[in-house]
Amino acid sequence: DLARRLESSLPMQRHDFVLRFMKGRFDSRELAVAAAMSVRLDIDKPYYGMVLCPEQEQNDQPFTMQEEPLNRVTGVTVCSVEMAAMNNFLYVVFADTEQGLHDVANALHQICIERYGHACVAMSNAHQNFTHAPACYLEAATAYDNRFVMDDSSVLEYSFVSVNLRDI
């Protein structure tokens, strides 16, 4: 009975982990990895980044890695939470390569285009230091905030948005 209750609380524990990670509540990589392992997430990968994707009326849950084409992306661990106040979903992507981050963001973009006819998917730069998670989130949020002035035909990348902001 206890095992069943613990198992049923796993989604909430993962949600809590993602929010704590995003806010930079872990003083070291080791502490973050241990906390993630306690909720059965393997985040001990060289790169991570954050992706924001809008919530749709037809979809009030984040996409899962079992959905096509996300299920074809390898070498990544993806955790997601609803950011209710902002009306979007945050995906924290831990990856073996920087390309894995792009693959997840592009897959999310493709899903949104196919299901809703439009997509606004924004991503941070790739990071390695887990203590930089708050800055990583701000990068994704900055890219997302530029959705009104940028074309949403592809993923809005912070590196691209920040270069264009300097030109304004």
What annotation goes with each model-predicted range?
Residues 113-125:
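Conserved short beta-strand edge segments in small beta-sheet-based binding/regulatory domains
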